[in-house]
């Protein structure tokens, strides 16, 4: 059955967190209760908007396909241009200076209250939760991060996130699920230049100077983006085979801008501008 609940109500169904207003379940704008939709949350590191659907000469056909069948947000911004703070804001609905994640999780920052994380809100509404790969809002210093956050299941480490996510999607599920699939790509270090991306013809992003070194750097970023796209495609193909696609909301985004000067860690459009693509279930015109 297709879920007809508004996206904002699915993501944060009640109250306010840290002064950020959220929909209340009794709000008159909500439709009558329907079968809850699954949520597939796909996220990358340091990608900004440097993918094919945003007009860049970077071959990401799976993300292009997702955009064509979903909705591409051209003016999406993160709440903070650093990894943990951005992710924590998105997943709690509260600003980093309110939720405690004012820096990086592996440098000692943490949420004041992990029960604010979306997995707890969704659990109260009957959801199961699973994490595959990167999370970056809890540290190994405090135990197993997925348990600290409150996920029901941990499926695998970053290098195998797409494989473990595909296995999860192939399982039968009696309850709606929130599946977080986190990728290391396109974080530095880059994997090296792809044969199809000749550095001599890779234009570096402004305001970087156009030099052989910056072209080589951009060529390597493009190779990382190709790898990210292939892994996302693996997950999306698994979703299509699973029978869950017609009742699954797909959210694909990144934490902040690319790891180049005046971008990541900077309050510029290049630092806080992020890709955001959402697809279905139902009611999405596409593009």
Q: For each predicted feature, which ranges?
A:
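Short, low-complexity intrinsically disordered segments enriched in A/P/G/S/L with frequent Arg
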Residues: 2-5, 9, 19-22, 28
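Low-complexity intrinsically disordered segments
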Residues: 2, 13, 31-32, 208
């Amino acid at each position: 059955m297709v879920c007809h609940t508004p996206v904002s109500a699915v993501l944060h169904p009640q109250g306010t967190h840290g002064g950020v207003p959220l929909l209340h379940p009794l709000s008159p704008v909500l439709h009558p209760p329907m079968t809850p939709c699954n949520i597939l949350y796909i996220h990358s590191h340091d990608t900004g908007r440097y993918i094919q659907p945003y007009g860049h000469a970077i071959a990401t056909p799976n993300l292009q396909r997702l955009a064509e069948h979903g909705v591409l947000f051209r003016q999406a911004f993160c709440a903070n241009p650093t990894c943990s703070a951005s992710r924590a804001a998105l997943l709690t609905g509260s600003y980093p200076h309110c939720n405690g994640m004012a820096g990086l999780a592996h440098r000692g920052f943490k949420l004041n209250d992990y029960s604010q994380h979306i997995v707890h809100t969704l659990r109260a509404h009957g959801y199961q939760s699973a994490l595959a790969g990167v999370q970056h809002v809890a540290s190994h210093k405090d135990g197993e991060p997925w348990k600290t956050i409150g996920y029901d299941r941990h499926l695998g480490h970053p290098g195998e996130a797409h494989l473990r996510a595909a296995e999860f999607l192939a399982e039968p599920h009696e309850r709606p699920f929130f599946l977080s699939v986190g990728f290391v790509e396109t974080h530095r270090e880059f994997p090296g230049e792809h044969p199809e991306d000749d550095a001599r013809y890779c234009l570096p992003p402004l305001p970087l100077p156009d030099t052989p070194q910056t072209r080589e750097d951009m060529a390597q970023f493009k190779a990382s983006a190709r790898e990210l796209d292939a892994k996302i495609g693996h997950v999306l193909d698994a979703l299509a085979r699973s029978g869950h696609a017609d009742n699954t909301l797909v959210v694909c985004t990144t934490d902040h801008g690319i790891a180049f000067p005046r971008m990541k860690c900077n309050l510029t459009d290049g630092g806080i501008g992020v890709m955001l693509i959402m697809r279905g279930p139902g009611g999405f015109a596409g593009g």
